[in-house]
Amino acid sequence: MNSLEQVKGLIKEEIQAAVLKAELATEEQIPNVVLESPKDKTNGDFSTNMAMQLARVAKKAPRMIAEELVANFDKAKASTEKIEIAGPGFINFYMDNSYLTDLIPTIVNAGEAYGETNTGKGEKVQVEFVSANPTGDLHLGHARGAAVGDTLCNLLAKAGYDVSREYYINDAGNQIHNLALSVEARYMQALGLEKEMPEDGYHGADIIGIGKRLAEEFGDRYAKADEKESYEFYREYGLKYELAKLQKDLESFRVKFDVWFSETSLYKNGKIDQALAVLKERDEIFEEDGATWFRSMTYGDDKNRVLIKNDGSYTYLTPDIAYHRDKLERGFDKLINIWGADHHGYIPRMKAAIQALGYDKETLEVEIIQMVQLYQNGEKMKMSKRTGKAVTLRELMEEVGVDAMRYFFAMRSGDSHLDFDMDLAVSKSNENPVYYAQYAHARVCSILRQGEELGLATGGDVNYKLVTSEKEVELLKKLGEFPAVVADAAQKRLPHRITNYAFELAATLHSFYNAEKVLNQDNLELSKARYELMKAVRTTLQNALAIVGVSAPEKM
């Protein structure tokens, strides 16, 4: 537990003790103590509505209850300087700030571990994201999903969850069939043979390249081979090539998956038949008009869904049900899917399937990612100026860099539309939020280098109690918030809270820097304490940016 959380814990304990001392309620009747941090700091560091919560039990007016609580509250035990009652009975606590200076060595000693909490208590969480068809380049929607998904995974891990990142490879549908036929056509053409591209084929230069490579490496071997053998070869070769390209792009984007799960494996391992057997055993499917239907309306879906069409083929839903059953059988406590906005209508039927399989529907959470609109020179950018096609993840990385992309994509709630200003993303100005946050880190590193020149890095005793100015206290309070921000953002699945925090910490640091002469050769004792404070800022900013997948440069 960090110092700030310890202080909050002490305040809660003293509130409970005051309730019992004032005989306002029994121990069993005391409600959960909620402490808020008021946005307006004139209302204190923390505030509680406990007096209102107790009104019914104590049978007194909240204001009167608040007065009794304050009279029985031990301020010394909870590092509290003063307590005020506001409005109908809010109790505002003003801390004496002695606890804040303890934060500096706490943060510095914790290093990369600062901000870690046990909120998740080791709960096994699987996050499935991106999962784009392996038949082409990743577009901006995939890029945003990758940034949000990976940031969420980093956040959950920081908050004590056991996280597994998974990519579902859609390798069993028509797209892969068309990919195989496209590879075959380009291979034949490279051999000088006539072969038309399939109607829904892939016409990109990369497939032409695959055809040429196959012709150079294998000659006409597969042109003469058995049709089934050659088809499997084209399919596997094309899929392997496209997956390698996806993996390379994602790794360049600092996204690595623990598991790459093949849809085809569900067919090969009998997982689809098993899932259907479970649904049949539980009387969740029925036959009608030659098709097999899932009774999804039983679980709140707007209509029942076909699982097996009258021609014997599966709908998209069938392997998806088998896949989610497989996930649950692997022992995950929570499944989080990051889906594009076009999948919103798919959520009720997927939750219905999980219920029908005998699991709690709340085991599945779906985070929706809205579309991204690029802007350049103040105008909407619909197509790549270089290729004339949709802008890809790779292209945008080359244009604006990974840091800007990771930060911009993660700085808004995923379910809100995102306008991405490419000019802003590369600008070296305070209006660019990623530059602003990174510059704060570089500024701190510069101060620390100056401190080393002054001999402040030699160790020895540090008088942290000298760190008392208004701007220093603001900075300490912001540093102390980090573990609580991590815990809350993880619980609520709101990764954009971390980019918000990084920006706020940077702003607080810049404000402190502009108001104070940070290091002063004429006051080395204060300078040493501030040197340690800067180390705490560096650690916290690094840790926040690391969650978002953004680098923390030492010089800019």
UniProtKB/Swiss-Prot annotation:
Assigned keywords, A-Z: Aminoacyl-tRNA synthetase, ATP-binding, Cytoplasm, Ligase, Nucleotide-binding, Protein biosynthesis
Residue interval(s) of motif 'HIGH' region: 132-142
Gene Ontology CC, one term: cytoplasm
Primary site of residence: cytoplasm
GO biological process, one term: arginyl-tRNA aminoacylation
Gene3D superfamilies, per the entry: Arginyl tRNA synthetase N-terminal domain, HUPs, Isoleucyl-tRNA Synthetase, Domain 1
SMART domains the UniProt entry points to: Arg_tRNA_synt_N (SM01016), DALR_1 (SM00836)
EC number, UniProt record: 6.1.1.19
Record InterPro entries: aa-tRNA-synth_I_CS (IPR001412), Arg-tRNA-ligase (IPR001278), Arg-tRNA-synth_N (IPR005148), Arg-tRNA-synth_N_sf (IPR036695), ArgRS_core (IPR035684), DALR_anticod-bd (IPR008909), Rossmann-like_a/b/a_fold (IPR014729), tRNAsynth_Ia_anticodon-bd (IPR009080)
Domain of life according to the entry: Bacteria
Family recorded in the similarity comment: Belongs to the class-I aminoacyl-tRNA synthetase family.
UniProt protein name: Arginine--tRNA ligase 1
Organism per entry: Bacillus anthracis
Classification lineage: Bacteria, Bacillati, Bacillota, Bacilli, Bacillales
